Amino acid sequence: MDIFDLMWTRRSIRKYQDRQIERGDLEKIIQAGLCAPNAGGGQRAIIVAVRNRALCEKIGRLNIAKFNRNSLAGSYVSSEQPSIIDDPSIRSGFYGAPTVCAVFGPKNFLYSVADAFCCAENMALAATELGLASCLIARGEETFDNEPGAALL
């Protein structure tokens, strides 16, 4: 696919098959993230790939723990793929994904969040090229900036 086809084809997918992606595909996705544009060309992103189901679920629960669903009530996303906004029965911010990649940047760096999203977008495009589903999930600070989240780091 060319880049335009990738951009037009990529979708946020919130339902996943019950199997891990191939290690080689994961490595390609991570490499795509690491070559993303970033502030000052510093290449500061650190990507942590989690393939342990129980740990993915635990981090996903931390991700959603402080999320105020009520603030977005009525912001319907999709009946085919309900989001945490639409469906209060969803207990993990990662929707049961078998692999989760967390993107970290320097604390107190003005462009860390922008850099992380550029990295994540490259990863999503690479996943699409490989025929894999993905969804960009925010709230990284809320997930790890607390005692249980910090303990996982």
What are these regions (language model features)?
Residues 33, 101, 106-152:
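Small-aliphatic-rich amphipathic alpha-helix that forms the alpha element of a beta-alpha
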Residues 42-116:
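Glycine/small-residue-rich phosphate/adenosyl-binding loop
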